[in-house]
Amino acid sequence: MAKVEQVLSLEPQHELKFRGPFTDVVTTNLKLGNPTDRNVCFKVKTTAPRRYCVRPNSGVIDAGASLNVSVMLQPFDYDPNEKSKHKFMVQSMFAPPDTSDMEAVWKEAKPEDLMDSKLRCVFELPAENAKPHDVEINKIMPTSASKTEAPVAAKPLTSPLDDAEVKKVMEECRRLQGEVQRLREESRQLKEEDGLRARKALPSNSPMAALAASGKEEGLSARLLALVVLFFIVGVIIGKIAL
């Protein structure tokens, strides 16, 4: 005996598409329409009942009316290489006069009175998921380009500025050399003068004479040491510029 053709209209007719990401519940709608002049009972079945929640999953559609069924896919780890084998079936039949006990209605239904339509599930990722990859490429390209252009932009700044700095440092170095030489000569003269004064003013074995002489020597030594340190720093700067 030939199977009765489905009287309900389905939108979509063949596929239920679920668009990710699938880290949360994804819902798609199935619209059932009843173009006939009789009420129609329906129920929705799936090959993977643990993966989906269907509301409403059964009921009665009045003549000329339609109904939206929400199919909710539960979160899962999506693998793009794995094809979905999940399927749905919409089963229907013309409603009997008494529909108060739908469970009994379906149990008592004859196979030749049942109509069904099958839909397969399709998982899709949104196009936006590919955009971060393009953004990363755009970030990498300008960075590498700037690195290659940087040495070209830096070339005009090197020679004139370095020559002027070297001249200034060399002049300062010569001035410091003269200052060091002058302080050495001054230190030598002061030592001689202090020695003569100390011998005239105090006995040679006096502690005061030795203290006065050592104090002046320490002052000159400190100034001389400071100049030597400064001279060393200038030398280091010249060495770096030369490199």
Curated annotation (Swiss-Prot):
Coiled-coil residues: 161-196
Protein's name according to its UniProt entry: Vesicle-associated membrane protein-associated protein B
Membrane topology: Single-pass type IV membrane protein
Signal peptide limits: none
Compartments reported by the entry: Endoplasmic reticulum membrane
GO BP term, example: positive regulation of viral genome replication
Marked site positions, Involved in binding the phosphorylated serine of the phospho-FFAT motif: K43
Source organism of this protein record: Rattus norvegicus (Rat)
Key word Membrane present: yes
Record-listed cross-link Glycyl lysine isopeptide (Lys-Gly) (interchain with G-Cter in SUMO1), residues: K147
Cytoplasmic side: 2-218
Gene: Vapb
Domain remark in the UniProt entry: The MSP domain binds the FFAT motif of many proteins.
Pfam families named in the record: Motile_Sperm
Residues with Phosphoserine modification: S146, S159, S206
A GO term from the CC aspect: presynapse
Family statement: Belongs to the VAMP-associated protein (VAP) (TC 9.B.17) family.
Assembly notes: Homodimer, and heterodimer with VAPA. Interacts with VAMP1 and VAMP2. Interacts (via MSP domain) with ZFYVE27. Interacts with RMDN3. Interacts with KIF5A in a ZFYVE27-dependent manner. Interacts (via MSP domain) with STARD3 (via phospho-FFAT motif). Interacts with STARD3NL (via FFAT motif). Interacts with CERT1. Interacts with PLEKHA3 and SACM1L to form a ternary complex. Interacts with VPS13A (via FFAT motif).
Domain MSP: 7-124
InterPro entries: Ig-like_fold (IPR013783), MSP_dom (IPR000535), PapD-like_sf (IPR008962), VAP (IPR016763)
Role this protein plays: Endoplasmic reticulum (ER)-anchored protein that mediates the formation of contact sites between the ER and endosomes via interaction with FFAT motif-containing proteins such as STARD3 or WDR44. Interacts with STARD3 in a FFAT motif phosphorylation dependent manner. Via interaction with WDR44 participates in neosynthesized protein export. Participates in the endoplasmic reticulum unfolded protein response (UPR) by inducing ERN1/IRE1 activity. Involved in cellular calcium homeostasis regulation.
GO molecular function: beta-tubulin binding; enzyme binding; FFAT motif binding; microtubule binding; protein heterodimerization activity; protein homodimerization activity; protein-membrane adaptor activity
Keywords: Acetylation, Coiled coil, Endoplasmic reticulum, Isopeptide bond, Membrane, Phosphoprotein, Transmembrane, Transmembrane helix, Ubl conjugation, Unfolded protein response
